[in-house]
């Protein structure tokens, strides 16, 4: 695990130096992915700004991790910002227009946070560092388009969720964070990732590997999970594919 961690830290460092960027900015939610990414970023020695952004939620784990980072790394400057008032105004305007989908509001929370991250990063000649893992980013597309999917670099997007947990253990991430059920923190009711997806990350990893290898699945329970995985992947491919462009070649 030491070699993997050092490889990612070196990769982040090299990218920042090649593009003459002076800081690393990321959202911290109290989840395993953002905790690992913010710690890997801090280990580069580059100025690191982890931001806790509350909107109708105040995750103590996010605050504890941000404090832990600042205590353990001299190059870390944590930030805590309450976006509730801003989002409340947006919510009122949306409802006035009849655009009151709770799913859309959940995505808008993610996009508002993305705006804040880029405001801070651009103001400090920095990079927005993504926190998505391979299962989310390239398996089922479990992220918000132009929200948490809007980043400059993605250090753990080639790491399975199980690998992220191993990194968290190696990096001594707070045990409460390692033990907490994964959640995107975008819903008022506090629903977990498993509540939304209908499967655990272990199941998703297994299905992702089966799909990539073309494994023939005959057990009914496993077949249902694989079909669920494929359905979600198909629905979200628009996030993973380039934006469709109307081809005008025949007019040239």
Which residues does each predicted region cover?
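ATP-dependent adenylation/nucleotidyltransferase module used to activate substrates
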Residues: 1-142
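Short, structured secondary-structure boundary patches
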Residues: 46-48, 68-75, 99-102, 149-155, ...
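Short, basic, helix/turn surface patches
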Residues: 74-81, 104-112, 155-163, 201-214
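Catalytic subdomain that performs nucleotidyl-dependent activation
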Residues: 105, 109, 127-200
């Amino acid at each position: 695990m030491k070699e993997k961690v050092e490889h990612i830290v070196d990769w982040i460092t090299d990218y920042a130096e090649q593009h003459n960027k002076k800081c690393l900015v990321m959202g911290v939610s109290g989840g395993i992915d953002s905790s690992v990414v913010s710690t890997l970023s801090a280990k580069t020695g580059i100025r690191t700004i982890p931001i806790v952004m509350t909107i109708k939620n105040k995750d103590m784990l996010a605050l504890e991790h941000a404090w832990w980072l600042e205590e353990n790394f001299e190059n870390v400057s944590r930030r805590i910002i309450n976006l509730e008032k801003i989002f409340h105004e947006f919510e009122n305007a949306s409802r006035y227009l009849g655009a009151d989908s709770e799913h859309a509001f959940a995505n808008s929370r993610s996009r508002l946070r993305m705006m804040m991250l880029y405001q801070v990063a651009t103001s400090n000649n920095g990079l927005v560092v993504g926190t998505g893992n391979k299962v989310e980013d390239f398996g089922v597309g479990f992220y918000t388009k132009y929200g948490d999917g809007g980043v400059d670099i993605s250090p753990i997007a080639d790491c399975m969720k199980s690998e992220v947990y191993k990194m968290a253990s190696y990096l001594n991430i707070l045990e409460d964070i390692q033990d907490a059920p994964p959640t995107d923190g975008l819903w008022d009711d506090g629903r977990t990732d498993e509540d939304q997806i209908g499967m655990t990350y272990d199941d998703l990893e297994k299905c992702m590997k089966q799909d990539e290898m073309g494994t023939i699945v005959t057990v009914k329970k496993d077949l249902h999970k694989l079909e669920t995985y494929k359905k979600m992947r198909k629905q979200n491919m628009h996030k993973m594919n380039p934006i469709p462009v109307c081809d005008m070649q025949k007019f040239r």
